[in-house]
């Protein structure tokens, strides 16, 4: 189906068996799963075709259970370990039953993705050390979106681009259609896979106040939560923390919206981070980077002005992926602080105190939790602590970069949207970021958002098709 937009004709031909709101990973997976059982499946994508896919455009890997190494992973990653990792980030799973289901079902995800056209690549090197736990798909997120679209076209799934769903037409506990500026799309079952509300700064401001004005949004500005708001207006129950989000440290010079993965900074474990007062505020070497990189967005969000500065020296400059924009550089710490616009004396004192606190005798190893640590300072640096003493010195200003919000709709194990009265909507299902708060609370694991979207996209699509067929 060709692109649609304001004033364009909507697809006709009577009600669709399943209409999916959103054309990112969760929506595409839901449509593919639904088409196995349903005759007429439609994806309604808000973006035009060149920008379709939402946050999925910016991803590159997925975290799944696997029992042994293969050509795309470097070792086994059993259920118990992934479950332990999930429970160890933030405050643990939102709903243990649904989180356990997600982890268990993840084992079959790579095979399902391969069967629908996805190609894989050998593990990538770099700071995140993900070769054992995560699989990387060839070409990144944009390639994943395009691959699923090609598969959808072969399967006879219709797609309309440039259509914004403003509301759902409801009759009691049933949805009868999707309301758009161009008319009503009738459907027997609906899957909401339209993402969170991270691009809605006014909504973020409800929970974070004026600090939200300093957040950068890693994905598209379309993710404004209007479908989520519509579901709430129709009595959907909430799941997830109001202030919960997946956010990372990004270059403060990044665009306000849609900077994607390229704006993330991976220098943090190899140096120190200071706030606008020139003081350290968190352990930069607390854990391996895949388990801790996602806390740094929140860490920075809680600092004055929502800004912090990553500082490192020449001897570690090649140990992580280079930043998208060139860092500040100077021959002295004071000169670097001046370039960054922070107090020279404070930063120099922080670096001097940090260097003096490093325990002697450690063996630096960026590939594991080494024994290079500080002693007698707060906060400590638990691993990878080396003196910052080799010019030139480098630094970058950082801000919180929000990927997606966790507050969403509560769902059943069949992905049906729950209502505040404890019942479920009969034919409305949810998948992906819009229901991620059932699984995630405050922390995040690299690649697990795609896992949630794929597992719950399959469930939602299959259940929606079954509901449409059985009435």
Question: Positions of the model-derived regions?
Answer:
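Conserved N-terminal/central alpha/beta ligand/cofactor-binding core
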Residues: 5-7, 40, 46-158, 271-280, ...
């Amino acid at each position: 189906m060709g692109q649609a937009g304001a004033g364009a004709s909507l697809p006709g031909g009577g009600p669709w068996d399943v209409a999916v709101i959103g054309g990112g990973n969760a929506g595409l997976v839901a449509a593919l799963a639904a088409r196995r059982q349903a005759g007429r499946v439609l994806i309604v994508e808000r973006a035009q075709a060149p920008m379709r896919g939402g946050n999925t455009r910016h991803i590159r890997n997925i975290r799944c259970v696997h029992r042994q190494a293969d050509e795309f992973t470097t070792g086994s990653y059993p259920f118990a370990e992934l479950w332990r990792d999930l429970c160890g980030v933030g405050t643990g799973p939102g709903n243990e039953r649904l989180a356990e289901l997600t982890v268990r079902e993840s084992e079959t995800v790579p095979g399902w993705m391969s069967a629908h056209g996805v190609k894989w690549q050998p593990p990538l090197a770099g700071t995140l050390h993900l070769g054992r736990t995560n699989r990387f798909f060839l070409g990144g997120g944009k390639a994943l979106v395009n691959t699923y679209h090609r598969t959808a076209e072969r399967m006879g799934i219709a797609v309309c681009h440039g259509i914004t769903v403003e509301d759902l037409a409801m009759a009691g506990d049933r949805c009868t259609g999707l309301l758009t500026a161009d008319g009503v799309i009738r459907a027997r079952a609906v899957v909401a896979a339209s993402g969170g509300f991270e691009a809605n700064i006014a909504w973020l401001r409800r929970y974070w106040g004026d600090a939200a004005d300093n957040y950068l949004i890693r994905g598209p500005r379309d993710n404004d939560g209007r479908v989520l708001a519509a579901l709430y207006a129709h009595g959907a129950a909430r799941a997830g923390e109001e202030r919960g989000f997946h956010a990372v440290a990004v270059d403060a010079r990044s665009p306000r919206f849609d900077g994607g993965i390229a704006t993330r900074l991976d220098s943090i474990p190899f140096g120190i981070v200071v706030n606008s007062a020139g003081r350290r505020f968190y352990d930069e070497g607390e854990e391996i980077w895949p388990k801790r990189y996602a806390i740094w967005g929140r860490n920075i969000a809680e600092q004055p002005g929502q800004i912090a500065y990553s500082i490192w020296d020449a001897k570690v400059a090649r140990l992580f992926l280079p930043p998208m924009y060139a860092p500040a550089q100077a021959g002295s710490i004071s000169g670097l602080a001046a370039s960054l616009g922070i107090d020279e004396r404070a930063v120099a004192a922080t670096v001097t105190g940090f260097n003096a606190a490093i325990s002697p005798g450690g063996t630096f190893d960026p590939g594991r939790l080494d024994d290079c640590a500080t002693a007698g300072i707060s906060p400590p640096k638990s691993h990878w602590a080396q003196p910052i003493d080799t010019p030139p010195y480098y630094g970058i200003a950082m801000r919180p970069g929000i990927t997606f919000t966790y507050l969403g709709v509560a769902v059943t194990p069949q992905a049906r949207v729950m209502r505040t009265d404890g019942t479920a909507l009969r034919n409305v299902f949810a998948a992906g970021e819009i229901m991620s708060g059932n699984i995630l609370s405050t922390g995040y694991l690299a690649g697990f958002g795609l896992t949630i979207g794929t597992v719950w996209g399959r469930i939602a699509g299959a259940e929606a098709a079954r509901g449409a067929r059985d009435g």
